[in-house]
Amino acid sequence: MSAPNSYDDEELEELLRRKAAQEQKRLEEERKRKAELESQKESILRVILTPEARQRLTNIKLVKPEFAESLENQLIALAQSGRIKVPLTDEELKQILEQISEQNRRDFKIQIRERGWK
């Protein structure tokens, strides 16, 4: 009776190997796709930003990667729709960052009402 068990174990091991190979292939394809998209994005940013503006964006990416990713996508969309002039200078990028900062700034006001006990 040990022969069928070893056969089942061999089948199971082969199935697991195939699944692992498929998963590895899928992950590799996904990594390649992401690298290709990142490469395309970088080439677009090289066209729409001056070197100084690209350096500022790189600095932002080091500190706030999620914000930088969102900003990159917004800049590309603005450039493609013609809403910003190309190439975008560092000063113009600073202005855009200030506008974003103002939009995101939240003023919290605490109101204290005096109520007398009557």
UniProtKB/Swiss-Prot annotation:
Transmembrane portions of the chain: none
InterPro entries: DNA_bind_arc, PDCD5-like, PDCD5-like_sf
A Gene Ontology cellular-component term: cytosol
Entry keywords, A to Z: DNA-binding
GO molecular-function terms, A-Z: DNA binding
Pfam families in the record: dsDNA_bind
Disulphide bridges, residue numbers: none
Similarity section: Belongs to the PDCD5 family.
Name the record gives this protein: DNA-binding protein M1425_1752
